[in-house]
């Protein structure tokens, strides 16, 4: 059985830190907490779980803080989490099995990171992260913001999921401010940083600035294809928000220059044609989304709803609009099979029940 150090960086996380530590305490052999300046009860809470609590002066650089936490680890492997992450029961069971059986030739274990959920708690947005790494001084965090460990060596893809359960009500400007500080200090952003900088601008409603930075990103040869495809989606959404619908569809279709269409692209294109009331074309794209398969090892951001929920809902709408009520009801029933308590499904069901009664 391997031994594991949990390494975390925290600041003012009293609302969530105990939930996290409670979920992981029996999975790891050591807990390392690096505090970057808490003024609440965070440190008091973490001391209930570990004495390995270290202060680290915040320097607008997440990688430095995370690398400091890694430097304190003494076990064979390092697990990292954020304070608002939890490991659910079914994933804890898989984690224990992994810990008992992991081949020590494995350098990195990728785990799913679920970051959005439906009202029943089912994940709707997920991607892989380099979650468990060998403690051999080979793996270091890079980038001051949206930090990452570059995956190398022998990599295992696991079905274990880490669940991100944020309680924050507003999207912080912290990351955007770090990027702006880097730029003001003359630091040239690499492709990955350029992508995330443009995305931060989008999240803060700075659509024209975001478009410019995304376009610069698309011209970077070293940029990852999956990020380029996502950039096309975000540019399209920016244009939608400034009422430029011609460029909205233009950049959705530009994504096809990089690879075959992803399910989220298909759904975005279908939605565009719904706006144009071209329902037959929208039907084509929703069906294309349904026929695609998830690639769990791709590393890309996955909106899981684009493989079933969103296309079923869209097809129900489209077929209703063109008067094909039989097919509209069919897709609503498919919707109900995956989400029987969904408000949209129940609303549509009542609508179709009334429609059948009026026809009869």
Residue ranges and their predicted role:
Residues 7-30:
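Short, well-formed alpha-helical segments that are part of the catalytic scaffolds
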Residues 15-18, 40-49, 90:
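Acidic helix N-cap motif at the loop->helix transition within catalytic regions
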Residues 23, 35-45, 58, 82:
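A conserved acidic beta->alpha catalytic loop
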Residues 44-68, 72:
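Conserved donor nucleotide-binding strand/loop of the catalytic core
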Residues 64-70, 81, 87-216, 222:
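Catalytic-site signature of metal-activated, phosphate-bearing donor transferases
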Residues 78:
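Short aromatic/hydrophobic "clamp" motif used to bind/position activated sugar donors
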């Amino acid at each position: 059985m391997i031994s594991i150090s949990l390494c975390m960086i925290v600041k003012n996380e009293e609302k969530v830190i105990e939930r996290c530590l409670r979920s992981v305490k029996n999975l790891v052999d050591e807990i390392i907490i690096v505090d970057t300046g808490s003024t609440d009860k965070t440190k008091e809470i973490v001391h209930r779980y570990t004495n390995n609590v270290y202060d680290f002066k915040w320097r607008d650089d997440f990688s430095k803080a995370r690398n400091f936490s890694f430097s304190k680890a003494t076990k064979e492997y390092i697990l990292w989490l954020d304070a608002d992450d939890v490991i659910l029961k079914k994933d804890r069971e898989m984690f224990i099995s992994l810990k008992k059986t992991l081949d020590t030739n494995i350098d990195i274990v990728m785990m799913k990171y679920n970051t959005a959920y439906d009202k029943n708690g089912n994940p709707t947005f997920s991607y892989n992260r380099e979650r468990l790494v060998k403690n051999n001084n080979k793996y270091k965090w890079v980038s001051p913001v949206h930090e990452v460990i570059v995956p190398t060596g022998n990599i295992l893809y696991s079905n274990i999921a880490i669940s991100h359960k944020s309680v924050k009500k507003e999207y912080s400007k912290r990351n955007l401010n770090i990027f702006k500080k880097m730029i003001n200090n003359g630091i040239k952003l690499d492709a990955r940083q350029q992508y995330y900088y443009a995305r931060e601008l989008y999240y803060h409603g700075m659509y024209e600035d975001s478009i410019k930075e995304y376009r610069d990103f698309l011209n970077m040869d070293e940029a990852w294809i999956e990020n380029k495809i996502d950039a096309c989606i975000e540019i399209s959404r920016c244009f939608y928000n400034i009422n430029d619908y011609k460029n909205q569809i233009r950049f959705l279709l530009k994504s096809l220059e990089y690879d075959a269409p992803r399910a989220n692209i298909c759904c975005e294109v279908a939605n565009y044609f719904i706006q144009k009331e071209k329902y037959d074309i929208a039907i084509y794209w929703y069906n294309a989304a349904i026929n695609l398969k998830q690639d769990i090892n791709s590393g890309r951001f996955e909106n899981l709803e684009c493989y079933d929920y969103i296309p079923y809902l869209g097809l129900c709408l489209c077929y209703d609009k063109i008067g094909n009520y039989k097919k509209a009801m069919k897709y609503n029933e498919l919707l109900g099979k995956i989400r029987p308590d969904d408000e949209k499904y129940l609303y549509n069901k009542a609508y179709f029940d009334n429609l059948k009664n009026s026809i009869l």
